[in-house]
């Protein structure tokens, strides 16, 4: 009977540990969906080129702010997670910084490609580039919310 009781307690503790893990996962997922990121406007509904240009510029500015904010939050989460492990913290922060710089370069080149068909320097070219950047910024924000990966 005692062996059964102890093994039952062990199973109960394991279940509680699993529940704690699942609860932590649920909190992370909930935070991801509840986070106040503004939805970008649909600029294709503009009545003329100037409206589309203004809308695309506004969206880009907003998503840039959100991107910078989320990057700072990701860095803060990493610092909190690795606060007692200086070497790991330094390596993670270096990797995060390197990844962000590489992503920014990717975004720049991808959006250059997206606006390639329009005349360089035109409002249309800028609109395509801004819409591309806004879309990629939103994707990156979602990815940054998952950092640190564990």
Q: What do these predicted regions represent?
A:
Residues 1, 6-7, 86:
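Intrinsically disordered low-complexity regions specifically enriched for long asparagine
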């Amino acid at each position: 009977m005692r062996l059964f009781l102890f093994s039952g307690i062990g199973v109960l503790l394991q279940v509680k540990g699993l529940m704690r893990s699942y609860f932590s996962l649920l909190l992370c997922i909930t935070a991801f969906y509840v986070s106040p990121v503004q939805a970008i406007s649909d600029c294709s509904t503009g009545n003329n080129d100037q409206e589309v240009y203004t809308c695309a510029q506004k969206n880009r500015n907003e998503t840039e702010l959100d991107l910078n904010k989320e990057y700072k939050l990701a860095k803060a989460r990493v610092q909190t997670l690795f606060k007692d492990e200086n070497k790991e913290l330094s390596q993670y922060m270096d990797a995060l910084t390197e990844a962000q710089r590489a992503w920014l370069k990717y975004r720049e080149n991808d959006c250059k490609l997206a606006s390639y068909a329009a005349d360089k320097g035109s409002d249309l070219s800028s609109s395509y580039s801004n819409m591309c950047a806004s879309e990629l910024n939103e994707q990156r924000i979602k990815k940054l919310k998952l950092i640190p990966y564990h």
